[in-house]
């Protein structure tokens, strides 16, 4: 009985940390893949931070990566518009309200982050994150969900 209680108590700090976690670490390397395919954002978070790291060796101009949040229905059109915007604008169409949050492009070994208010996300809507570097979005994509 005592061992069962100790076993159960061992998980309490983990559960509490997960419940109050309002940031996530995301990375991508030269293989053009994020280290995660989904991110859960607690509705209780006033702000949420994405810490992004390019774990590869390729330069920003050669194969930069970033993290962009948008409604899933908008990602393909945003990716096309991003190619037109070019690398100087992080392959992000300037002042486009469909872009909900993003990090700048970074090259191998570099890190960046973005903080946003989860209140911009609506219940029942489908959201995705992707890399906006030219033509990366088709392989580098994941889902974002609001969770209780």
From Swiss-Prot:
On whether Disulfide bond is a keyword of this UniProt record, the answer is yes
Which Cys-Cys disulfides exist here?
22-45
- Pathway(s) this gene product operates in, as recorded in its UniProt entry: One-carbon metabolism; methylamine degradation
Q: CDD domains from the xrefs?
A: Azurin
Localization annotation: Periplasm
Q: Which SUPFAM superfamilies match?
A: Cupredoxins
Q: Where is the Plastocyanin-like domain?
A: 19-148
What are the binding positions for Cu cation in this chain?
A: 65, 131, 136, 140
Annotated GO MF terms: copper ion binding; electron transfer activity
**InterPro entries reported in the protein's UniProt record:** Azurin, BlueCu_1, Cu-binding_ET, Cupredoxin
Superkingdom is Bacteria
PANTHER family, sorted: AURACYANIN-B, OUTER MEMBRANE PROTEIN H.8
Described by its record, this protein's role is as follows: Probable electron acceptor for methylamine dehydrogenase.
Protein name per Swiss-Prot or TrEMBL: Azurin
Q: What is the lineage of its organism?
A: Bacteria, Pseudomonadati, Pseudomonadota, Betaproteobacteria, Nitrosomonadales
